[in-house]
Amino acid sequence: DAEHSPNTPLSVFVETYKKVIGEIKKLGKIPVILNLPPVDARKYFRWVSNGVNGDNIMKWLGGDEIYIYRWHEMYNAAICDLSNSMKIPMIDIRSAFLVKRDYSDYLCEDGIHPNERGHKLIKDTLVDAIKAVLPGRTAADVNG
C-alpha cells in the first residue's frame, strides 16, 4: 500500500534536461533533443514483476498496467514542452515507432529499451532528420 516513486521523479528529469541544455548552449552549440520511444506497458509490467508479487504492483497501478504507458507519456510530454518553451529543435523518434504495426518488435524484453531493430529505426530517423536540414548530403555523409 506504500506510495512508490519512479527512480527519477518528473521534476528532477526536467531540471536535469534543462541543465544539460544550458551546458550545451554555454559551449556555443545548438542543442537538439529527441522525444522518447514508446514503452510497451505489458512487457514492462512482466519485466518488473518477474520474481516479485505482481498482484501488489497491479494494485498500486490501480489494476491497469496501461498506467505505466501514461506515466511514461508524462516524461515524453515534458520533453516536448521543453522543446517548445526553450525553442530547442526536437527530432520525433516516437512516431517512427508508433507507426509500426507492432512497435514492441523494436523494444527489448523489458519493454522500455530499444533493441537492435529499434536502434536502427532511431538511426534511420536521425539520418532522415539531418538530411532534411542539411540538403545535398548523402546517407554516407551523415553516417560518416
At which residue positions do the language-model features occur?
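Alpha-helical cap/lid subdomain in secreted, periplasmic
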Residues: 1-144
